[in-house]
Amino acid sequence: MKKISLKTLRKSFNLNKSKEETDFMVVQQPSLASDFGKDDSLFGSCYGKDMASCDINGEDEKGGKNRSKSESLMGTLKRRLSAKQKSKGKAGTPSGSSADEDTFSSSSAPIVFKDVRAQRPIRSTSLRSHHYSPAPWPLRPTNSEETCIKMEVRVKALVHSSSPSPALNGVRKDFHDLQSETTCQEQANSLKSSASHNGDLHLHLDEHVPVVIGLMPQDYIQYTVPLDEGMYPLEGSRSYCLDSSSPMEVSAVPPQVGGRAFPEDESQVDQDLVVAPEIFVDQSVNGLLIGTTGVMLQSPRAGHDDVPPLSPLLPPMQNNQIQRNFSGLTGTEAHVAESMRCHLNFDPNSAPGVARVYDSVQSSGPMVVTSLTEELKKLAKQGWYWGPITRWEAEGKLANVPDGSFLVRDSSDDRYLLSLSFRSHGKTLHTRIEHSNGRFSFYEQPDVEGHTSIVDLIEHSIRDSENGAFCYSRSRLPGSATYPVRLTNPVSRFMQVRSLQYLCRFVIRQYTRIDLIQKLPLPNKMKDYLQEKHY
């Protein structure tokens, strides 16, 4: 029997213990090492390669190999305990330590792994080059209408700014028509905050915010506002204009037989505004105008006796603006007349002569006012009626047309209602249409051959013109020529191809009273265009 000494037993016992510990360390830790190996690409920027692939068992395995065989079990336990304490101390140190000192033990690895994995979303977003804010935007429910309105305000709209300009004009829409007051207030607050951050847009928002939508400045309607016929300087500085085609430049003795005669329209002397440069005033001639042709033309302003007499129905024109209140009517009659005028959608201010007629017939009762209104509505449907155009515009429309062509327009003389412009002997002539006692005529005696309807008067004149001149025209000036009048070719405004903006204005004026145009949600330029002369 072989003898085994106590020393040999101790050595064999120590060897077995060290083998068991080594196996325990090898089997326990590779799971953590493999986990770190899988995330090598994830933590590559945070840790070095040597640290990312470091052996977690480094210190313990080396310690196990270099450990002397004679080391006791208590020494091994003490060494492991000291290694654990040292690893815990190193885990609490800041991240600025070097990679050599950053070694892991089995107890510190889960803690460090948890802290590192918390940084994974930040690393992944930076690798994909997506820039997200760490704090998400606060979400609140918004409907599509509110979003669209806000985008209209931010992108397309031009809102009142501190330095207004004509480019800021456009189609204005009230937020009150689109949203409730609470929504408006919420949008106003959001817009104010956004404007303060941008610095480009300065908004001054109230409860009701006018906003420009749809149109840009280059889309605005470009037009020229014509001067009104009543726009004169002071009374003493008023000048006169004589057109080259005016019949007053021809001197002849009118025939005394064969046909009737009616005076021409003298508004070219009283009311026209263009000053011809070739006309000079000679102080040696008492109130006479000398033209380049040498014809002496007497001015109606030379003396008060030369002014043509007023119509017996119409009072003289006042300087102040006439109020449309039907003061001549009282009670129910005034209400009936006003309601009928509004129902027929006719404004007396649309024509200078019409306004005078309305004032003059107030005392005749509501039936006369209603009858005249209906007659003027009927007149507006005729193609040969051109509305409030000047005599110069009428001459332009009658240029290069044959004799017998004519049109009817509003008179430029405030004392009369309508004028007739016609062609005769290659010239464009003008005459007034008289209105007295509810009858219309070309003569100073409307009771003889007057018509209660303007349309009937023109149609009767066209029928009479088929057999020749139905009357003759002469000027009030002595020695002026007489021209035969034939109305055979009415010049219709419907034959012209009008612009789209004109047609839009025409439709709006058909369905909107002129006194309500200022209340439309439109820019001021469009309102001015709608209130211009509509023919």
Curated annotation (Swiss-Prot):
Print the keywords alphabetically.
Growth regulation, SH2 domain, Signal transduction inhibitor, Ubl conjugation pathway
Can you provide one Gene Ontology molecular function annotated for this UniProt record?
signaling adaptor activity
Gene Ontology BP terms: cell surface receptor signaling pathway via JAK-STAT; defense response; intracellular signal transduction; negative regulation of signal transduction; negative regulation of T cell activation; proteasomal protein catabolic process; protein ubiquitination; regulation of growth
Q: One GO cellular component term, please give it.
A: cytosol
Q: Which InterPro entries match?
A: SH2 (IPR000980), SH2_dom_sf (IPR036860), SOCS6_SH2 (IPR035865), SOCS6_SOCS (IPR037345), SOCS_box (IPR001496), SOCS_box-like_dom_sf (IPR036036)
User: Would you say which domain of life the source belongs to?
Assistant: Eukaryota
**Residue span, SOCS box domain:** 486-535
Give the pathway.
Protein modification; protein ubiquitination
Q: Where is the SH2 domain?
A: 384-491
Residue ranges annotated as compositionally biased, kind Basic residues, are 80-89
Region annotated Disordered sits at 80-105
Q: What is known of its domains?
A: The SOCS box domain mediates the interaction with the Elongin BC complex, an adapter module in different E3 ubiquitin ligase complexes.
PANTHER family reported in the protein's UniProt record: PHOSPHATIDYLINOSITOL 3-KINASE REGULATORY SUBUNIT, SUPPRESSOR OF CYTOKINE SIGNALING 6
Function (record text): SOCS family proteins form part of a classical negative feedback system that regulates cytokine signal transduction. May be a substrate recognition component of a SCF-like ECS (Elongin BC-CUL2/5-SOCS-box protein) E3 ubiquitin-protein ligase complex which mediates the ubiquitination and subsequent proteasomal degradation of target proteins. Regulates KIT degradation by ubiquitination of the tyrosine-phosphorylated receptor.
How this chain assembles, per its entry, is:
Interacts with RBCK1. Interacts with phosphorylated IRS4. Interacts with PIM3. Interacts with KIT (phosphorylated).
Q: What is this protein called?
A: Suppressor of cytokine signaling 6
Q: Which organism is it from?
A: Homo sapiens
Question: What gene is it encoded by?
Answer: SOCS6
